[in-house]
Amino acid sequence: MIYPDRFDVIVIGGGHAGTEACLAAARMGCKTLLLSHNIETLGQMSCNPAIGGIGKSHLVKEIDALGGAMALATDKGGIQFRVLNARKGPAVRATRAQADRILYKAAIRHTLENQPNLWIFQQAVDDLIVEQDQVRGVVTQMGLKFMADQVVLTAGTFLGGLIHIGLENYSGGRAGDPPSIALSRRLRELPLRVDRLKTGTPPRIDARTVNFDLLEKQWGDEPRPVMSVRGNRAMQPPQICCYITHTNERTHEVIRNNLDRSPMYSGVIEGIGPRYCPSIEDKIHRFADKDSHQVFIEPEGLTTHELYPNGISTSLPFDVQLQIVRSMRGFENAHILRPGYAIEYDFFNPQDLQHSLETRVIGGLFFAGQINGTTGYEEAGAQGLLAGINAALRAQGKAAWCPTRDQAYMGVLVDDLITLGTKEPYRMFTSRAEYRLLLREDNADLRLTEKGRELGLIGDEQWQLFCEKREQIALEQQRLKSTWIQAGSAEAEQIEAKINVRLAREYSLMDLLKRPELNYADVASLKGEPLAGEAAAEQVEIEAKYAGYIDRQQDDINRLRAYENTLIPEDLDYAQVEGLSNEVKQKLSAARPQTLARAARISGITPAAISLVLVYLKKRGLLKRLKDDHPVPEQQAG
């Protein structure tokens, strides 16, 4: 039967991508349906119980700046918070939170169930309804049809999922969940490039069988960082300690002696695994000169004894896993609660997508998350949010939107995927962003919340908080610029004691704040009242100290903006562009970049090649530029 109600947007899958996608579309006013094979697993953390980290927390805070759920759920479920790279510059600082799986999932579930315009239904999807290269709806396992002209697919590792433990394997989406076989077959019928990737997870340990006296303790930071602009320390649950142990030569010997029983090294697994989160057998093989590897022992929650040993992901047979675990200090008598495993799954070449994450071949069909070749909750959530936004915009007959590389890490993520593609699971790092000094985690709201409000993503409460913070920053910057300290004054003596230099002339408080020896607290209270808000005060200090660098980076962006705004006709015949090598012609024809800037980022495309294309466009009268706030041009809704 056909379900009697029609929807604007249907989202398939209730993981980190799916939840952000359906929430975004619903916040924008679209009648949205979330379909999941099991609503008890909505927002489940399938792998490690943590959110954030280097590069990843930037994505979390950008999701939050656009009204998403991940950061606030982390504050409600986070049982240890730390700032990574705290001694380095603000561009690479990152917040990481250990999360209670149950509390995090409950926070996501509560958000979903209380979101207006959002309906939830428990059924796996087996088929898509496609008419004349346009998606029209989906068919569930029970034959029930739901109709919508926008469908967001966020199937994670479930498409053709195959779980490996040793040389044995069986079908599964993750441990305890069935795979999506029928949907995988259906998608393979579409003119999309598909391949296989793999990821893995470590065995889980019973804390009652671990000798913690032998482990190094790792406490969180105090004062605790807060992940969401809507969050606070009062909502964070009780905090716990994590621990550190190490592999040793005995561990490595066990692994080396059993590599022939590894599905990775025996050729059973075809998919490529994540480079930056390798299995323990991969570490031993690739870094043969190292006699030890760090293992972080992460509690799974406040009400469970289950431990997650971060650093020993493995698909070796269970008897080998037991030897590996018990070879480590403190784990001599450890009991494994769940075995580690690897999972192989389908992913689709992201170069077959537009920057809106809509497929190029099927109108209204959007992909987000691991099926686009990424790894990580944060990468999935960011894509889900953007896919949900663009599905809603399409339903409303509006042009698609995607932030550019100088606006957000989300823009870097999507642009890398669509322009360069990926052969291995893609993980975000700060090093991937050429404008990272502008794309700090501390200013995500200042970069994106105004756009989020324009799109209909931001509620009144978050908007008010944002406006107050922005006003506080502006007023305080003006106060610091207009407040002066005279040489020889009592205030000058306070400053001289800290910088060991005599002030020979008058300085504004802003000038003093730019000095590396002084922080905001040192100068703000010399005259007048300092800001009470930590986030606003931090912003004032960072913008003062890095003003010169920030201005230079902005100049670089302005110079490149001409390329960013120069459109390439969708049907341009690169074979007609004189001077281009055959290799360059093939790459440009395959990628179909929408702007010269995106063409320039394709591997192997030289500045000379870009100049030839630019000259060709000028000669043929094809030179066109984006006129407004450089949105990404996409196929109009239809």
From Swiss-Prot:
Cofactor(s) for this UniProt protein: FAD
Keywords assigned by UniProt, alphabetized: Cytoplasm, FAD, Flavoprotein, NAD, tRNA processing
Biological process according to GO: tRNA methylation; tRNA wobble uridine modification
Lineage: superkingdom: Bacteria
Compartments, as annotated in UniProt: Cytoplasm
Positions that bind NAD(+): 273-287
Gene Ontology MF terms in the entry: flavin adenine dinucleotide binding
List of residues binding FAD: G13, G14, G15, H16, A17, G18, V125, S180, Q370
HAMAP family for the chain: MnmG_GidA
Function: NAD-binding protein involved in the addition of a carboxymethylaminomethyl (cmnm) group at the wobble position (U34) of certain tRNAs, forming tRNA-cmnm(5)s(2)U34.
Full protein name: tRNA uridine 5-carboxymethylaminomethyl modification enzyme MnmG
Origin species: Cellvibrio japonicus (strain Ueda107) (Pseudomonas fluorescens subsp. cellulosa)
Gene that this sequence comes from: mnmG
